[in-house]
Amino acid sequence: MAEVGRTGISYPGALLPQGFWAAVEVWLERPQVANKRLCGARLEARWSAALPCAEARGPGTSAGSEQKERGPGPGQGSPGGGPGPRSLSGPEQGTACCELEEAQGQCQQEEAQREAASVPLRDSGHPGHAEGREGDFPAADLDSLWEDFSQSLARGNSELLAFLTSSGAGSQPEAQRELDVVLRTVIPKTSPHCPLTTPRREIVVQDVLNGTITFLPLEEDDEGNLKVKMSNVYQIQLSHSKEEWFISVLIFCPERWHSDGIVYPKPTWLGEELLAKLAKWSVENKKSDFKSTLSLISIMKYSKAYQELKEKYKEMVKVWPEVTDPEKFVYEDVAIAAYLLILWEEERAERRLTARQSFVDLGCGNGLLVHILSSEGHPGRGIDVRRRKIWDMYGPQTQLEEDAITPNDKTLFPDVDWLIGNHSDELTPWIPVIAARSSYNCRFFVLPCCFFDFIGRYSRRQSKKTQYREYLDFIKEVGFTCGFHVDEDCLRIPSTKRVCLVGKSRTYPSSREASVDEKRTQYIKSRRGCPVSPPGWELSPSPRWVAAGSAGHCDGQQALDARVGCVTRAWAAEHGAGPQAEGPWLPGFHPREKAERVRNCAALPRDFIDQVVLQVANLLLGGKQLNTRSSRNGSLKTWNGGESLSLAEVANELDTETLRRLKRECGGLQTLLRNSHQVFQVVNGRVHIRDWREETLWKTKQPEAKQRLLSEACKTRLCWFFMHHPDGCALSTDCCPFAHGPAELRPPRTTPRKKIS
């Protein structure tokens, strides 16, 4: 064997050995946190087992010449006892996480540590979902696999037995030591550039008493039976020597190690990158407030769907007409669409349905999510208060409506299966309510971003939680009050707000709809001390529902456009209810304005902006700090770069009316100076005159494609320094990206819009 890495733990305090096992659980359940070429891992089974005594022992080797005292595992004083491990009743799925804080959130306290080391993983969080997924492994085959492996160890593979038990030279491993054994499937990322996409199975042997965890790859023999490979076997171990803690990575038979660069990296990566992460995680005492990533769906199915959608809709990035970042918004919506498609696919399998679910996206924004879901066969539409430029590019098959949604009896969707709220802002808390009152079969998916209550902004009430965590709990409370089982999951999207809430089923039978709706009404009324409604606007219960036996699926676009008025009247006639109020469910709600107000200083008059820019520039240039630099042709040129002032110092030099005018804009003075990036640099709260000689050096280091894009944007605006700086522009006309005079101006490059089929 060979030790490929060993590191000491700094300042362990009381975190070890518990922290070591928490770090190991991250690598076991969520290996993609460290290895970015993996999609995740699926834990298929977990059970307790015992290694046999060796019938014939050969010389064993140790990780090094130094004799080590093994650190106690979770069974020795760290998590403190508890029941032994038991086999899983069904396959479990290890879930993914893209942030270290989330990954380290598991198993930090002693009781939780013992659970992580010795009992089955928690269920996926929703009934009937964990069973029957891909990769199921029969218990009989597991018994046979482990029995064959144990016999091979006892009969002649003494070196591997010594490696598993971390025995020193010439020593015998303890007989019948209880071990935790995990069968896991490692799932590579599906990518056109990675030919290896087949998941790999392995057995993981966790010796909690000896402080080791060993990874044993599996392979199929000629008859299709799984057996343990003798190559690519490695071990992570915790040791304790002279009051110091160490983590080591060892490889059994390094000459047999075959690196594919994905599931099995190079040994140097294990001994450096992985070891460094394990050491860091072991001493981080962080607890996450959020669920693991993709905990409600199959990671394997999601990875495949995401790559297919990403390839299918990648052209959207090239034709994106909005001012927002296309890389972020396109791939974020692709990831959300992939998640929903797998969630709905598994729901159809669970409910034994064939028709694809219908949907309405409330506050659909750019409409790309609606376009993808519709293109993938789900009937639906999107509604937003403001039309976007990109809507014209989708084509007639993508149904998008410009309309304001006010929660009332006229904005219900009785024949729709799912309501979607993707960053739906002021509609976010209302979506569970609208879904609950639309029909008993209507479900919801929300991805909260901005914090809104039923009326206005959400106000924090618990300082011990982050505002984001508290707001998520509020939306979950709304969903539960509306009668939903609310599941929480974390998406893989390029956003800090990536926790979604899913309401798939109800907590009550359909016969109790009227009483539950009464509670909904009272809850909404109780939020933030809602005042008594004026006459004609009484907040009365709204017993609107569709019988549980109804189909609940859209039958063409006509069904999507159906309203709930006839349903409400039928219910009222049957139950003797009086007429319902026609107004909003909660007076005071205002949908966002159709015309979005620009508050980034861009709407200020050009003369005013130019005046402030010139005033601040003269203020900075008053410092008379001359600097001499070589120009591109090799000659020396002295140029006044000005001094550096803080934003507060700059603001003190501006008159009161100018500051008042800037204060009405988001960001004020700083935003205006950042917008004038040709002239200024704002770094760490200090304002500098931009030196374009440094920018030119940066440009020459860019890839050829990036340089071509930059050159296409040249000479479309006048050079401020050529026009206003006392020393002129620091660059020659050939090197400056801006026009030295009107004669050099070029028309801006425009990209023709393409229709998206």
Swiss-Prot record:
The modification Phosphoserine is found at residues 78, 533. Its main location: cytoplasm. One of its GO terms (molecular function) is zinc ion binding. It is found in: Cytoplasm. It catalyses: uridine(44) in tRNA(Ser) + S-adenosyl-L-methionine = 2'-O-methyluridine(44) in tRNA(Ser) + S-adenosyl-L-homocysteine + H(+). GO terms for biological process: tRNA methylation. GO terms for cellular component: cytoplasm. A zinc finger (C3H1-type) spans 713-743. It is an enzyme of class 2 (transferase). InterPro entries: SAM-dependent_MTases_sf, tRNA_uracil_MeTrfase, Znf_CCCH. Residues 72-84 have a biased composition (Gly residues). It comes from the Eukaryota. SUPFAM superfamilies: S-adenosyl-L-methionine-dependent methyltransferases. Residues 123-136 have a biased composition (Basic and acidic residues). Its EC number is 2.1.1.211. Keywords: Cytoplasm, Metal-binding, Methyltransferase, Phosphoprotein, S-adenosyl-L-methionine, Transferase, tRNA processing, Zinc, Zinc-finger. Pfam families: AdoMet_MTase. Residues 55-93, 108-138 are annotated as: Disordered. Probable adenosyl-L-methionine (AdoMet)-dependent tRNA (uracil-O(2)-)-methyltransferase. Belongs to the TRM44 family. This is Probable tRNA (uracil-O(2)-)-methyltransferase.
